[in-house]
Swiss-Prot record:
Pathway connected to this protein: Metabolic intermediate biosynthesis; chorismate biosynthesis; chorismate from D-erythrose 4-phosphate and phosphoenolpyruvate: step 4/7
Similarity comment: Belongs to the shikimate dehydrogenase family.
Keywords: Amino-acid biosynthesis, Aromatic amino acid biosynthesis, NADP, Oxidoreductase
Function: Involved in the biosynthesis of the chorismate, which leads to the biosynthesis of aromatic amino acids. Catalyzes the reversible NADPH linked reduction of 3-dehydroshikimate (DHSA) to yield shikimate (SA).
GO cellular component: cytosol
Cleavable signal peptide: none
Catalytic residues (UniProt): K67 (proton acceptor)
Species per Swiss-Prot/TrEMBL record: Xanthomonas campestris pv. campestris (strain ATCC 33913 / DSM 3586 / NCPPB 528 / LMG 568 / P 25)
Enzyme class at the top of the EC tree: oxidoreductase
Binding of shikimate, residues: S16, L17, S18, T63, N88, D103
CDD domains per record: NAD_bind_Shikimate_DH (cd01065)
Catalyzed reactions per annotation: shikimate + NADP(+) = 3-dehydroshikimate + NADPH + H(+)
UniProt-recorded name of the protein: Shikimate dehydrogenase (NADP(+))
């Protein structure tokens, strides 16, 4: 029997842990699969995905900066992908790509089950309004948060995200320069890529955003998360959490969509933490 082909698309993508995660899931469940990382710039993504499908690709994950492009080329969409306006999981069915988004489910599962957080009643600051932010915002609302304030370098994108979520009573956008006037939050989520240059000054956020319960969460992991988590610790946030757990949980959701079985995530998460010093330092 030929081995099924899967991949993660991004730009850049060489750093991705997804191939290792899905290889571990395959061993755990006894499912033979070939999962690789494919670097595709936005203008090359459609052609790269077509080649992948022609070569027998059955499913794909999509990371920055391609999630909104994946949304646009999906022949059909899950409800959560439609609300998010972004796709991180593609399933090949009847010669077409079906788009889904497992990011939000992965984040909520990591925060509530791995870290034991109760999201109900929390006031949330969401930094960013791109594909990553769009992926997690609907799931946070479903988890019972009280209010979400979206702040983005481009106010128009923040407004567009708020409009797409369709809950004006709970979701508002604010300007970056207004951060000092926003009050404090129980959850601060960094959904930007500002930490990629590892500049600690990129997250010189006001200390007034933090209260005694604040959990600061970076959707990135590894070196990219270090600057934001350093700020979180200096601000004495109760929790400083990187995106590794979310990555593993969203991968498990994708795996279940493709194979019909949800793998155990704790062994994979623990193994990744144990083997990589950068990941440990970003925890």
């Amino acid at each position: 029997m030929p081995v099924s082909r899967y991949a993660v698309f991004g730009h850049p993508v060489a750093h991705s842990l997804s191939p290792a995660i899905h290889a571990d899931f395959g061993k755990q469940t006894g499912i033979a699969l070939d999962y690789t990382a494919i670097d595709a710039a936005p203008e090359e993504f459609t052609a790269a995905l077509e080649r992948f499908a022609a070569d027998g690709g059955k499913g794909a994950n999509v990371t920055l900066p391609l999630k909104e492009a994946a949304f646009a080329l999906s022949a059909s969409l899950s409800d959560r992908a439609r609300v998010a306006g972004a796709v991180n999981t593609l399933v090949r069915n009847d010669g077409q790509w079906q788009g889904d988004n497992t990011d939000g489910a992965g984040l909520v599962r990591d925060l509530t089950e791995r870290h034991g957080l109760d999201l109900r009643g929390r006031r949330v600051l969401l930094l960013g309004a791109g594909g990553a932010a769009r992926g997690v915002a609907p799931a946070l609302l479903e988890a019972g948060i009280t209010e979400m304030v979206v702040v983005n370098r481009s106010p128009e994108r923040a407004d567009a995200l708020c409009d797409a979520l369709g809950e004006p009573g709970r979701v508002v956008s604010r300007y970056l320069e207004d951060l000092r006037e926003l009050g404090d939050f129980e959850l601060i989520v960094n959904a930007t890529a500002a930490g990629r240059d590892r500049d600690a000054g990129a997250f010189a956020l006001p200390l007034g955003l933090v209260n005694s319960l604040t959990a600061a969460v970076d959707l990135n992991y590894g070196a990219t998360a270090i600057a934001f988590l350093a700020w979180a610790r200096s601000a004495q946030c109760r929790y400083a959490i990187d995106g590794l757990g979310m990555l593993v949980e969203q991968a498990a959701e994708s795996f279940a969509l493709w194979h019909g079985v949800r793998p155990q995530t704790d062994p994979v998460y623990d193994a990744l933490r144990a083997r990589d010093a950068v990941l440990v330092s970003a925890d």
